[in-house]
Amino acid sequence: MTRTHDDEWDLASSVGATATMVAAGRAMATKDPRGLIDDPFAEPLVRAVGVDFFTKMMDGELDLDAIENATPVRIQSMVDGMAVRTKYFDDYFVDATDAGVRQVVILASGLDSRAYRLPWPAGTVVYEIDQPRVIEFKSNTLAEVGAEPTATRRTIPIDLRGDWPAALSAAGFDPAAPTAWLAEGLLIYLPPEAQDRLFDNITALSAPGSTIATEFVPGIVDFDAERVREMSGSFREHGVDIDMASLVYAGERNHVIDYLNGLGWRAEGVTRTELFHRHGIEVPAPEHDDPLGEIIFISATRTG
């Protein structure tokens, strides 16, 4: 499915299905005896979406021989990648709230359950922004399993291509208070100019002491669309509505660290490979790695 300026999705199709795939990875990482992350809500959310492929992936029941390029090593490298990514952003929020931040915004929140599972200090407000169907599904599913937010949770059912800053303000967001922003797993699905506009809007809403965390994928510049299209074709044969080659926006774009520094942030990054080493996880061989290549995880602080 080719992207359009006003395309929509649920959690079983298009960009939404990638959120479900990521949640399945978190569920598998949660079961890993190494115990790097703990997301008890990932599994029930994925089961509620009802895509058989992802349910079987969580349960270790996929017939990998029937799926092109799917091997136990590749699946494990994906799970490990989700583990270090989730751990990085979990730690980011803990550090931000330890520094006194009590206002959080999660952009394109998908099946993110941090508002329910992190130990937020009293008085913390977590704003979640995503398409209306995605927000409604997650809220209803977590209510059905008896989950309760560990912070004040406010949902903003709007696409990021809309006037989300106005919707955020209408929900009670205070631009005078420091904010911890998260844009996880988002940027590759934005055109280059939309990526810049996102950070421009965040900067305009950020008081000194605000922070932002995201990731940058240098490989999006020379994206191997053919390799990804072959992998996606195999997924679609098994009922997964994902064509990554048509979902992402490839080509030149500003490096996030440089762009944020130019807007008055102090940004720094760490590669996924470095995070693997930090947590004692084996770095996958290139043939088993993400087709996008290396990922840089970035955190930044608003300096003034």
From Swiss-Prot:
<dbReference type="InterPro" id="IPR007213">
    <property type="entry name" value="Ppm1/Ppm2/Tcmp"/>
</dbReference>
<protein>
    <recommendedName>
        <fullName>Putative S-adenosyl-L-methionine-dependent methyltransferase MAV_4444</fullName>
        <ecNumber>2.1.1.-</ecNumber>
    </recommendedName>
</protein>
<dbReference type="InterPro" id="IPR029063">
    <property type="entry name" value="SAM-dependent_MTases_sf"/>
</dbReference>
<dbReference type="Pfam" id="PF04072">
    <property type="entry name" value="LCM"/>
</dbReference>
<comment type="similarity">
    <text>Belongs to the UPF0677 family.</text>
</comment>
<keyword id="KW-0808">Transferase</keyword>
<comment type="function">
    <text>Exhibits S-adenosyl-L-methionine-dependent methyltransferase activity.</text>
</comment>
<feature type="binding site">
    <location>
        <begin position="159"/>
        <end position="160"/>
    </location>
    <ligand>
        <name>S-adenosyl-L-methionine</name>
    </ligand>
</feature>
<keyword id="KW-0949">S-adenosyl-L-methionine</keyword>
<dbReference type="GO" id="GO:0008168">
    <property type="term" value="F:methyltransferase activity"/>
</dbReference>
<feature type="binding site">
    <location>
        <position position="130"/>
    </location>
    <ligand>
        <name>S-adenosyl-L-methionine</name>
    </ligand>
</feature>
<dbReference type="GO" id="GO:0032259">
    <property type="term" value="P:methylation"/>
</dbReference>
<keyword id="KW-0489">Methyltransferase</keyword>
<dbReference type="InterPro" id="IPR011610">
    <property type="entry name" value="SAM_mthyl_Trfase_ML2640-like"/>
</dbReference>
